[in-house]
Amino acid sequence: MAAEEGGLNLTVSETLQSLLESYRRMQMPIQQYLSFILIPSGAFFVVTIVAAILIDLPMSIRAPIPLLGLLAFGAALFYPKILISQRKRQLNNRFHLLVTHMTVLATTNIDRMEVFRKLAREEEYGELANEMHRVVQLVDTWNQSLDDALRRRAKEVPSDAVSDFFDRLAYTLGAGQSLKDYLITEQEQIIQEYSTVYESSLDSLEVMKDLYLSMVLSMTFALVFAVVLPILTGTNPTMTVSAVIVMYIFVQSGFFLAIRSMAPYDPLWYHPPEKSSPTDERATKSFAAGVGLSLVLLFVSFGGMFGFSPVALGDIIPLVSEPLPLPMYAAIPITPLLIPGLVMRQEEEKVKARDGEFPSFIRALGATEGVKQSTTSMVLRTLRKKDFGTLTENINSLYKRLNMRIETSEAWRYFTAECRSYLIQMFSEMYLVGREMGGSPKVLGELIAENMNEVLQLRQQRKQATTTLVGLLYGITAASTFAFFIGLEVVNILASMSLDLETSSNFDVGTLINTGVYDIPLIEFLLIIIIMFGAMLSALMIRTIDGGHNMNTYLHFVTLTWIGSLTALATKWLVNVFLSI
């Protein structure tokens, strides 16, 4: 017992210490935060408590008032902690790319401070670029040495990986070792740290999947009870079902936000706003076609249902007769969204294939340039004849632009824009900058290829996690829909049986079961809503973990909705068949 109390005290102490540390690391002074945010929110909490005591209203209205004040005070109290956690995540997300970029710059003929200045101007690195800028400010403005500036920032950054890197770099530079030698020897350790963080994120997602499964099963049972129990208690089933659905939506949304915060940052796509590609054109056309057809089907289906459309679904879709089962009115109108989903799925596979070929290409390019001591266009003249899969066409386009004397940097930017790959864009930019500043092409090619291969191996693990999640969500959708409609159909059959009993005898069935409180079509409509909401959130979860294009969401959304709709129809048919025997 004493050990448990000691462990609890230690946990509370660690939490308080972590919270105080987050206050210390805020950009805003602590006194200013206390005066303008924390103390006013605490006063607001006290006011809500007093108001709940003094106001002459029913308890059901007064009770939530202090909860509003508690929410405001809790948000103000823990906001610095949340802010520091976000900064830590931003620092860790691109850390391996920044170190690789730093190594590329260090292999060139520029001063080590110029390396930090260039990285500070790279907006792509976000919070890491800000840290580089702070280091540069300490050196340029406050006349500190680079190693002293790094030690000072190591104490302030919330990321352990970045802090440790700054500490070791400061010690190495202070000892007289060159930045280039240190970074080349550190590459393997940095990638290993990134792999550890990446894999731990995937492990956390595995735990979240188990928790999500337990939550959905619990909420499914709650919803089934909300459908069935009113037949015995006589309460309004529409209210109980609506209450459970609202809770279901909040809990599912919370899990989605948690999964989004845990997923490793590893975007697949690169979207340059100033340069379009054939991929953009196909995406735009497929999106317009899918959304346009969905709107037409939506108008026809509901217009035919309510009588304000001259045609119905049965008139334009073969083998469909009116009236349709209610689940079909949810599934059929959104089916055309498969068009953009499938198109972007194909384009995404091409991007992944280009990513797989790029390490071989950049290694061959660097090695050949190093041996021949010639320009990139001269090397590409022979290199483009090799088979690099889907990347070959982009390499040919790069060669043609360089051969037309288009500026080298602009030709490479067109190359990355056509590839549409985030990694290819980042590493191509590093190679280009390294070559322009006199770096060894062979060293650059080997360095970039090795780092990209490590990231691609981690992506394979991410793909396996996504595949497992897809199977889990598809199975959960079918199982929960089956449970929903079993309860609804049992109630529907009991209601029809009670009517038969009342007409065939003088027995008052209402003393045993309360079927008159049910509005079956309305409850079925509510169940269809929760199926579609679950399909939407499940599709978003898959896209978040997969890291792919936003339009991939449509593919899983439509598929999950059809699974739910067909399961609902099959369940209703099976229950009627078995109970009629």
Task: Show where each model-derived region lies.
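Hydrophobic alpha-helical transmembrane segments in multi-pass membrane proteins
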Residues: 130, 160, 164, 215-223, ...
